[in-house]
């Protein structure tokens, strides 16, 4: 990479979650794009081709998982909320709405390792999670 892109990457690494969220919003406004739309396109691509052979491969070993918050202990709501914020990078209000809407998909297309780690983290603080 060029020196300029290395510097930008280093700057991005130092951002807090709140700053990163604000940056995403500014990029969306400046370039007329949506971060959510990009994720939808990525999610649609694996199912787009292959037909029966793709279904056979999926039956062998699934590589992408959706992490779904099914429910949570009311006393642990704040802890679950913090874990959801850490996993998604959402702001407080957005994460709160997501948690309160359980059952709700909190992460789509996660690798097996990431999905399992997130499931363990949320269950450790009082949430009930399923992987699909």
UniProtKB/Swiss-Prot annotation:
One of its GO terms (molecular function) is mRNA binding. One of its GO terms (biological process) is translation. GO terms for cellular component: cytoplasm; ribonucleoprotein complex; ribosome. InterPro entries: Ribosomal_bL12, Ribosomal_bL12_C, Ribosomal_bL12_C/ClpS-like, Ribosomal_bL12_oligo, Ribosomal_bL12_oligo_N_sf. Gene3D superfamilies: 3.30.1390.10, Single helix bin. It comes from the Bacteria. Belongs to the bacterial ribosomal protein bL12 family. It holds the Pfam family Ribosomal_L12. Homodimer. Part of the ribosomal stalk of the 50S ribosomal subunit. Forms a multimeric L10(L12)X complex, where L10 forms an elongated spine to which 2 to 4 L12 dimers bind in a sequential fashion. Binds GTP-bound translation factors. Disulfide bonds: none annotated. This is Large ribosomal subunit protein bL12. The keyword rRNA-binding does not apply. Keywords: Ribonucleoprotein, Ribosomal protein. Forms part of the ribosomal stalk which helps the ribosome interact with GTP-bound translation factors. Is thus essential for accurate translation.
């Amino acid at each position: 990479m060029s020196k300029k892109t290395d510097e930008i990457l280093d700057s991005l690494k130092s951002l807090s979650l709140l700053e990163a969220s604000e940056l995403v919003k500014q990029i969306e406004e400046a370039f007329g794009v949506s971060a959510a739309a990009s994720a939808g396109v990525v999610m649609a691509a694996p199912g787009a081709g292959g037909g029966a052979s793709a279904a056979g491969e999926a039956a062998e070993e699934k590589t992408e998982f959706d992490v779904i918050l099914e429910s949570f202990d009311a006393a642990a709501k704040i802890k679950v909320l913090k874990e959801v914020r850490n996993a998604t990078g959402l702001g407080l209000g957005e994460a709160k709405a997501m948690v309160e809407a359980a059952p709700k998909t909190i992460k789509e297309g996660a690798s097996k390792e990431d999905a399992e780690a997130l499931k363990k983290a949320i269950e450790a603080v009082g949430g009930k999670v399923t992987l699909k």
